[in-house]
């Protein structure tokens, strides 16, 4: 995405500061060995989970995870992230991968935030639909279709308007399938 690339180039062209990878107690996450009151900052350990999850899958399926993550991998790695973590996934994560001799992401796909009927999703305000509850009512592929119809190369937020969702599914899928079935 051009806007992500431009923002990363702006940061790289500026005065990058040292990155403090520790947080003081009280904090959650992984403790730093030999430092009782210090924890690794979440954006240090969280992306490492991508490799750990891949390795777990590969171990269970007798695949060498380095075929995917190794420096000489022929596979592409695509990161789908929210716009608020571009800084970490576009600067620090590639630096960590490079220093560890892992392959770098082929592409970073950043998207905006998701709102529900025009409101920010929030547990406390009860403006939230969990994926499992949604799947009890609608097929997940319908939601994927709806989101895909809303996405573009920009980093715009997406509003899940349930009335618009039903209208879009009915007009784009049900109506067209009905017309095809008439032939």
Residue spans for each PLM region:
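Structured secondary-structure scaffolds
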Residues: 1-183
